[in-house]
Each structure stands twice: as structure tokens, then as C-alpha cells.
Amino acid sequence: MKKIIKHMFEEKEDFYEYLHMYKECTDPIAKGELRKIAEEELHHYKHLYDIAFGKADVEHMSMLEHGVHEYATNVYHDMLKKLEVK
């Protein structure tokens, strides 16, 4: 599970990097490609999130697991929100 979560947060960093480039880009074609890449990173993050927490019993998680789950959920919602802004 640690490897999955580590990979999730690598995807998160990649997402924000591509999102930043997308927002700074002035070329319409490149901007479209950067957005597609950011969307792919979001999809990868969500896939890993589902693997890590999809069948998790939230009521029986340790404090650490619960904290990581809550943080990962908040990150996912932030990513969705930021990608909506064009």
C-alpha cells in the first residue's frame, strides 16, 4: 500500500506541474495538449486512489490511514476543481 500511495502523490505532483504549464501556455495547440496530459495524470491518480482506498473500511482504519485517506480525498477534489478552471 505504501508504494501505491507514493505513486499517487507522484501523479499529484505531475498533475500540478502540467496544470501550471497549461495555465502559463499561450499557444492554443500546446495548451490543449497540456490539458490532456493533466487530465491523464488526474485519471492515474484516481485509479491509484481506487486501488488504495476503494475497498477500505474507513471505520476500522488507524489514525494514520484515516489521515492519509482524508488527505488523498481532499487532493483529488482539489485536482478536479483546479482542472475545471480554464
Where in the sequence are the language-model features?
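Non-heme di-metal
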Residues: M1-K86
